[in-house]
């Protein structure tokens, strides 16, 4: 399959050889949205605010006395800061991962666009918190499994191979 014709390049043949996987990739926590839908449980990224060059991202939480805090994000381990009781979403902060690009609600449109661009593969990650909402569940969340099954079916409808990482 040649993507660019010889006429377009002055006689030089360009393009990808047959079997080349042309596609794209996404990361569930940045892209999916639907952060509290379909039985999905919370992940640390759900309590991480937006940021910029001048304002670092922060993690928001409540201490044991009920006071709200927003501290700079240093790393992604699950340990709360000293005196912390639980992570929480606080008013006045933007949590960009809550919506991402709203793939959760628009995956059919997005996958159709991927097909129009000629994608043959779509690399995606799976949000563990959509499959095991509490992190220690004995059984997976069926609604979460169905969401990913529907994505795979939609990819196959357009001849796109899902590649899960």
Can you annotate each of these PLM segments?
Residues 2-164:
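Non-catalytic accessory regions flanking glycosidase/transglycosidase catalytic cores in CAZymes
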């Amino acid at each position: 399959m040649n993507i660019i014709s010889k006429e377009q390049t002055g006689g030089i043949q360009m393009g990808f050889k047959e079997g080349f996987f042309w596609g794209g990739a996404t990361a569930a926590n940045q892209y999916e949205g639907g952060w509290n839908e379909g039985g999905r449980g919370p992940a640390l990224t759900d309590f991480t605010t937006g940021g910029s060059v001048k304002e670092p991202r922060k993690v928001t939480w409540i201490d044991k006395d009920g006071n709200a805090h927003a501290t700079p994000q240093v790393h992604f381990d699950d340990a709360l800061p000293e005196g912390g009781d639980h992570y929480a979403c606080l008013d006045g902060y933007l949590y960009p991962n809550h919506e991402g690009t709203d793939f959760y609600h628009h995956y059919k449109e997005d996958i159709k666009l991927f097909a129009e661009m000629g994608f043959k593969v779509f690399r995606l990650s799976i949000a563990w918190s959509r499959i095991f909402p509490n992190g220690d569940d004995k059984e997976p969340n069926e609604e979460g499994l169905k969401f990913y099954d529907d994505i795979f079916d939609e990819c196959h409808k357009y001849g796109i191979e899902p590649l899960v990482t």
